[in-house]
């Protein structure tokens, strides 16, 4: 449930307060669960209005377009009413059993990404005028002076980054 683009987690107590106060469905997107140190998946039985979404996209399998929802059966029944028929292509259907058999490999891959994320974050923090924000995802948000110039310089080095300059006033620079 870390968010994009900051990569940070909301305090569990804040999410719990929303779950207790909301009269309807609360969706927690855990697309980055493989990199986060927290999850609400184990709380689905505790909160009947909680639906957790997950995907394999963030662990290097975006092309499969495979995600899933975990919730009380009544919510899944409602989703099934609007779900398109044949919503998984044949390739994805063939790969799913292989993925399930390779959970250790996926966990190792996520661990490597977390390790490299830590190295990148530390290196960015050592650069002058760069602020790298804590993250629980597979990316690092950093504030740099003159972001368009940094973006172009990195692109010329063959390094592609997402330039968020101008997206929101709090993301300027």
Residue map of PLM features:
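Active-site pre-lysine segment of PLP-dependent enzymes
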Residues: 5-59
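PLP-dependent aminotransferase class I/II
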Residues: 49-126, 130-133
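Short glycine/proline-enriched coil/turn segments at helix->beta-strand junctions
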Residues: 20-25, 46-48, 101, 127-129, ...
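Short, well-ordered alpha-helical scaffold segment located
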Residues: 39, 74-75, 146
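Conserved C-terminal alpha-helix-loop-beta "cap" of PLP-dependent enzymes
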Residues: 125-131, 139-173
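A general structural detector for well-ordered alpha-helical segments in enzyme core domains, enriched
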Residues: 14-18, 120, 150
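Short beta-strands and strand-loop turn motifs
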Residues: 1-3, 28, 133-135
């Amino acid at each position: 449930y870390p968010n994009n683009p900051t990569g940070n987690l909301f305090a569990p107590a804040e999410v719990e307060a929303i779950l207790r106060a909301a009269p309807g469905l609360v969706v927690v997107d855990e697309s980055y669960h493989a990199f986060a140190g927290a999850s609400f998946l184990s709380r689905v039985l505790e909160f009947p209005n909680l639906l957790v979404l997950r995907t394999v996209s963030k662990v290097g399998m975006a092309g499969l377009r495979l995600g899933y929802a975990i919730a009380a059966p009544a919510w899944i029944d409602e989703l099934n009413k609007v779900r398109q028929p044949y919503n998984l292509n044949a390739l994805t259907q063939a790969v799913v059993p292989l993925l399930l058999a390779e959970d250790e490999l996926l966990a190792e891959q996520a661990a490597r990404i977390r390790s490299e994320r830590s190295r990148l974050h530390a290196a960015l923090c050592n650069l002058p005028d760069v602020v790298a924000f804590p993250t629980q995802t597979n990316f690092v948000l950093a504030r740099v002076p003159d972001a368009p110039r940094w973006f172009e310089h990195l692109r010329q080095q063959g390094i592609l980054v997402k330039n968020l300059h101008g997206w929101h006033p709090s993301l300027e620079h």
